[in-house]
């Protein structure tokens, strides 16, 4: 069962970040903690989470959560209780591969994290907000990708998984309206960002640093934007390629 809503006297804002052990999740977690938020961080690498927690021990709580495991929801709810509530969930966990050979292990690993794990945690967050809807306005934010707006052959599992995330958010939003659950949604769609997800030896078009992308993502979350493409250059590219019909798109060779 979802945990109870926090007490009315607990005025410190609270955010839980899934996938906070490195990259964007780590940076956003430390930024929110520095700003005075109570931050719950979760990932599989507890040693890395402890290092981050020690930067702001009064503001950060850490939990080892593998989103692909059956106990992920229980541990997620335990983390909500540990920080006494959740104003925002940010799902920043993700994995993907350049995989033109469609290797089975890479495909299944991608789908386990980006589809099953994502649905498991965001659905649990929705249930939490539904159980506390009259007292605690909710916000579910997720870092998806512009890759979710088109099928990308050399990263088929990744792009399809990101499309799933975007559609799942849309479906939850509709459900929230139908059930009158007070929760907002933010779909964050970045282009290439230099994080451990990418091959450090490769060059990528219009690649962004974490220092550049993180503040843009944080602004989108705090302003509760419904969809935010990161950054403006990628917004233009994304707008253009969405206009390309599939009969043309299938002939385009994307390589990186």
Give the residues covered by each predicted segment.
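Conserved glycine-rich cofactor-binding loop
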Residues: 21-22
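Rossmann-fold cofactor-recognition segment
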Residues: 56-71
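Conserved NAD(P)H cofactor-binding loop of Rossmann-fold oxidoreductase domains
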Residues: 92-98
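Short alpha-helical oligomerization interface
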Residues: 99-112
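Active-site helix of classical SDR
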Residues: 122, 161
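Residue(s) in the substrate-gating loop at a strand-loop-helix junction
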Residues: 145
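C-terminal helical subdomain
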Residues: 187, 202-238
